[in-house]
Amino acid sequence: MSKKYLTKDFFFLYYPWIYTTNGYSMERIVFHIDVNSAFLSWSAKQVLEQGYKVDIRERVSVVWVEEKRKCFVLAASMPAKKLGIKTAMNLYRAKELYPGLIIAPPDYKYYKQCSNELIKLLRKYFPTLQQYSIDECFVEYTEDIRDYWDPITVATELKDFIKKKLWFTVNIGIGNNKFLAKMASDFEKPNKVHTLYKNEIKEKMWPLAIWELFGCWRRMEPELRKMGIQTIWDLAHKNKQFLWSVLGNYWKVLWELANGEDNTKVIDNYDERKGMGASSITRIDTHDRDFIISFLERFAVELELGLMDKELSGNVINVWVRHTDFTYKSHQHRLSHLINTADKIYEYALLLFDELWHGEDINLVGLGISWLKKTEFKQNTLFSLITH
């Protein structure tokens, strides 16, 4: 796929019915691009490249992570999910559900490579791109591609090209803001394109169960149900004073999302000289320290890979968590020397984490390194924490 796939001439020649000399609707359009079961998909791609004859995406399979002799499911295939095997589940429990479970170890170096390949491909066509995590990003379609009438066609062409070129599938959500685009990408999977425009909220989003609203956690669901809030429509039409009494200050955020309101910009984070970071929701509210620090371990490896790629080192480490009431807490520490290896980043991250966390439930954890400088990269125990 060359750049002609995303040019005015290409669409006028091959899709004349979608092009108009009056231009496109000036309503803002955002794409959310999300790799389907990313770690599982990338492990499947890796073993296929190594000669394995079976695509584990089509089998009951998981990628697992070990932390202090506890094994957790890091990612599950679609067939595994249908059997009730979920992210964060104890691996032994997953094996009880399906004794023939195929298990694959994580390879974060390879995952980072796959992520970089995707972002590099997308940047050829979308100058304004915000990488949201290792496996998802937002692009500002309206600003960057002003001559196209039908974003669905563009998204479908892009989705198919990613599958052909990179050997893994993505969902692409299209909406009038980042929130709607992200909600759309979570509709039916895998390898799909979905829209959720403002005029489609009533039909596509409001009938959904309240826990399917991005930003609304299952922990909230029982209390909301007691108040008669079972669907997103119920939340969108509740009295604001009533919501404040139930949700506190977070009511405004959820109410705005339930009504499809989101004014946040797609912020290009291409310039990594200022700092690099990684964060992830834990999928569940948890106070399991071993499970939480397994994320920090993974992030340390991701950061080493990014630093190595850019030949950078840094001396400020930052760790942050999000509590179940959606308040954030962070700690950072400035070192007297530069570091760039996973083992050192992880070492300081653990110290910071234990300072800021006191056993309470959290649902997001993040790790960053900043004050970066160009330096010779020293490889000490690269990936040894995870892969050996």
What feature does the model see in each segment?
Residues K4-Y5:
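Polybasic, lysine-rich low-complexity intrinsically disordered segments
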Residues Y24-S25, E212, M220-L364, L372-T387:
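DNA-contacting surface of Y-family translesion DNA polymerases
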Residues D9-V246, Y250-V253, T375-H388:
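Gly/Gly-Pro- and Ser/Thr-rich, intrinsically disordered tail segments characteristic of DNA damage-repair
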Residues W64-E66, T142, S279, R322, ...:
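Structured loops at beta-to-helix junctions and adjacent beta-edge loops in soluble globular domains
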